[in-house]
A protein has these predicted regions:
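Hydrophobic alpha-helical segments
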Residues: 2-5, 60, 91, 107, ...
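Active-site region of PLP-dependent enzymes
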Residues: 78-83, 93-179
């Protein structure tokens, strides 16, 4: 997924361990999860990919048996549900990135949710600090990313580029999916 999932683990001196995916959902394969758990395992990060929720029944059952905390990465599945329950409601906490390349974006930033009052207070403490304010470099980067998005990725621009590509393909100037 993203370095933002792994870096906090590494910053704490822990070692991230990856579990292979299910080919139909691109989510963690719960059948392989238990084999990756050791006595050092503290957290399972369940990433819901491309709008497909993980098998949260299996993941939370494995975690509960071992006393392991589950945190959900909901960045790519904003609004998705698993068995009638919205993603982000299964673990101790969940987070949603609103970075420019996510399905739901504010450019930068994100959201964390939890049903744990102590953890909620710690998260609020982080938000009250200067850690949540973008630096001048980040503001400049965001401005540049927005300009690139508007120029090259914006739907009208993309449609124009596709039409030009199709035209050039028909004329034999390029080889592509329309040839």
């Amino acid at each position: 997924t993203c370095v933002m999932d792994i870096n906090p683990i590494k910053y704490l001196g822990a070692k991230p361990v990856y579990v292979d995916i299910e080919p139909n959902t691109f989510n963690m394969n719960p059948a392989l999860l238990e084999g990756k758990i050791t006595s050092k395992t503290k957290i399972i990060v369940a990433q819901h990919t491309y709008g497909y929720p993980c098998d949260m029944d299996a993941i939370t059952e494995i975690a509960a048996k071992r006393g392991i905390v589950v945190i959900e990465d909901c960045c790519l599945s904003f609004g998705s549900t698993y068995k009638g329950k919205t993603v982000g409601m299964f673990g101790k906490a969940a987070y949603f990135s609103f970075q420019w390349n996510k399905p739901f974006t504010t450019g930068l930033g994100g959201m964390a949710i939890t049903n744990d009052a102590d953890l909620a207070e710690k998260i609020k403490g982080l938000c009250d600090s200067d850690l949540c304010m973008p630096s001048a470099k980040e503001v400049l980067m965001l401005t540049a990313q927005l300009a690139v998005y508007r120029m090259f990725i914006y739907p009208r621009t993309t449609a124009l580029a596709q039409n030009i590509f199709r035209y050039l393909t028909k004329k034999g100037a390029v080889v592509g999916s329309s040839s």
